[in-house]
Design a protein with these regions (language model features):
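Nucleotide-binding/hydrolysis machinery
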Residues: 1-4, 79-89, 96-196
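Conserved post-Walker A coupling segment in P-loop NTPases
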Residues: 1-32, 43-59, 124-130, 178, ...
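Structural recognition of the conserved hydrophobic beta-strand(s) that form the central parallel beta-sheet
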Residues: 8, 51-52, 68, 88-94
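Residue-level preference for short helical/loop micro-motifs built around acidic side chains
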Residues: 13-16, 33, 57, 77, ...
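Substrate-gripping "pore-loop 1 plus following alpha2 helix"
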Residues: 33-38, 63-84, 93
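Loop/turn-to-beta-strand initiation segments
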Residues: 46-49, 65, 86-91, 108
């Protein structure tokens, strides 16, 4: 599948009412505003991989449809009864405790069983202190390039201490945002202060 499509969907960026249409597509007139039919992420990923970021936020109704698509390799677009055949590998990413969501009735146990073939647990950033400065330097370099700067800024000792003292509850995304803001605001080659 490495030569096949990799399609992503950030489930946190969509309202629950839009997730099903994004995943499975829709027919013209399926709902208000559906002026034309649209291919969903499952069809776009046919033969390849579909990455569902923040999979724990998907509503139960859409989870049921995902389960059927995984088990049977087919689904219907929103507003259609015509089955669409797909061969898609699903990768889910989440900060949520999916077994806990299953116990609370907010995630389907059988979908978790189907998706949990191989689970990779990435510890929170606060448990990977050695990664913090490396990631911060990477994000600073990328942001400097985006801003058209010749050299990426470095971090002062105090800024480095701040990076390591902070618990990073938002993990890598929060670190990236903090560093990008610091680079944007910094007009010298050294970042001296971080807003954390």
């Amino acid at each position: 599948r490495w030569e096949s499509p990799l399609v992503t969907l950030n489930c946190a960026a969509l309202s629950p009412s839009l997730i099903e249409a994004e995943l499975f597509g829709h027919e013209r007139g399926a709902f208000t505003g559906a002026a034309a039919g649209r291919v969903g992420r499952f069809e776009a990923a046919d033969g390849g991989t579909l990455l569902l970021d923040e999979i724990g936020l998907i509503p139960l109704e859409a989870q049921e449809k995902i389960l059927r698509a995984v088990e049977y390799g087919s689904f219907e677009r929103v507003g259609s009864s015509q089955p669409q055949q797909v061969d898609v590998r699903i990768v889910g990413a989440t900060n949520a405790d999916l077994p806990g969501l299953v116990r609370e009735g907010r995630f389907k146990a059988d979908l978790l069983d189907r998706l949990a073939f191989e689970v990779v647990r990435v510890p929170p950033l606060r448990e990977r202190a050695g990664d913090i400065l490396l990631l911060a330097q990477h994000f600073a370099s990328r942001m400097a390039t985006e801003l058209g700067r010749d050299e990426p800024p470095t971090f002062s000792r105090e800024a480095t201490r701040s990076l390591h003292r902070y618990a990073w509850p938002g993990n890598v995304r929060e670190l990236k945002n903090v560093v990008e803001r610091a680079v944007y605001r910094c007009d010298s080659p050294v970042i001296r202060e971080l807003l954390v």
